[in-house]
């Protein structure tokens, strides 16, 4: 395993929450404009529109699409951000360097037949990628036996986040991909993650992951009600986050992805 990491429809809004989401929508739109997401395929100069939707724009993709997209995460756009801290800030440029390193080192390898691939799509651009592998027996895989006390009642990891990268200008892409995987794993997920750098470990710990073996971190969201909650449909989502997700307006209308992908019926940047 190479886990390399660089809702309910019953929504109740207050006026302040609505204003918060409006502000976030505008902030995201400004960010995406910097990423050239506002360029239409036909070259029109009309401004792109964004909307908030109850379904995250995360879609399954095939291996070929994943490999094509992962190359972009160590391509010119990301390396330009990494090399220009005066324009993007030291923090964002450092994040871009980590993203490029992870994508280049671990993006393409021989995957197992259980590997699955997901893209976080905004308009016609992929702003986050995730590769997952199946679960396993903790007794058989972990050298340490601390998991017995850390996760009483559990014997099996439900899935492994094998790799995740997110565009350095999209702050929540990684978190939303993680949320999506927890939802796929059902009501009692136990998610394995391998963090390969100190920043990844620190961020994972903030989201509730605990270290079991060296670099192996595991999340049981039920142990962290301050960080994770479930909707009335028993779907996992981040605590105290707006229950809506940003989409380009065209995405919300057509629910289509420009890359080779198909939708399935299952219902702040992680790394």
UniProtKB/Swiss-Prot annotation:
Gene Ontology CC terms, in alphabetical order: extracellular region
Post-translational modification: Phosphorylated.
UniProt keyword terms in alphabetical order: Nodulation, Phosphoprotein, Plasmid, Secreted
Localization per Swiss-Prot or TrEMBL: Secreted
Chief site of localization: secreted
Family: Belongs to the NopP family.
Protein name: Effector protein NopP
Organism: Sinorhizobium fredii (strain NBRC 101917 / NGR234)
Protein's gene: nopP
């Amino acid at each position: 395993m190479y886990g390399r990491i660089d809702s309910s429809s019953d929504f109740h809004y207050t006026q302040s929450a609505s204003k918060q989401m409006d502000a976030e929508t505008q902030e995201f739109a400004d960010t995406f404009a910097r990423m050239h997401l506002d360029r239409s395929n036909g070259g029109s100069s009309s401004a792109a529109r964004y909307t908030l939707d109850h379904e995250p724009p995360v879609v399954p993709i095939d291996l070929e699409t994943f490999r094509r997209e992962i190359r972009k995460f160590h391509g010119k756009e990301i390396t330009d951000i990494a090399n220009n801290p005066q324009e993007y800030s030291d923090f964002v440029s450092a994040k871009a360097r980590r993203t490029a390193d992870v994508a280049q080192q671990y993006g393409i390898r021989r995957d197992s037949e259980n590997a699955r691939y997901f893209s976080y799509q905004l308009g016609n651009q992929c702003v986050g990628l995730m590769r997952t592998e199946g679960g396993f027996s903790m007794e058989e895989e972990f050298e340490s036996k601390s998991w017995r006390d850390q996760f009483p009642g559990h014997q099996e990891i439900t899935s492994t986040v094998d790799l995740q990268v997110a565009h350095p200008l999209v702050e929540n892409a990684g978190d939303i991909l993680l949320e999506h995987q927890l939802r796929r794993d059902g009501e009692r997920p136990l998610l394995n993650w391998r963090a390969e750098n100190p920043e990844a470990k620190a961020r994972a710990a903030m989201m509730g992951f605990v270290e079991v073996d060296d670099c192996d971190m595991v999340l049981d969201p039920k142990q962290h009600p301050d960080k994770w909650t479930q909707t009335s449909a028993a779907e996992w989502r981040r605590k105290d986050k707006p229950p809506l997700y940003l989409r380009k307006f065209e995405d919300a209308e057509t629910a289509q992805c420009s890359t080779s992908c198909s939708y399935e019926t299952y219902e702040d940047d992680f790394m």
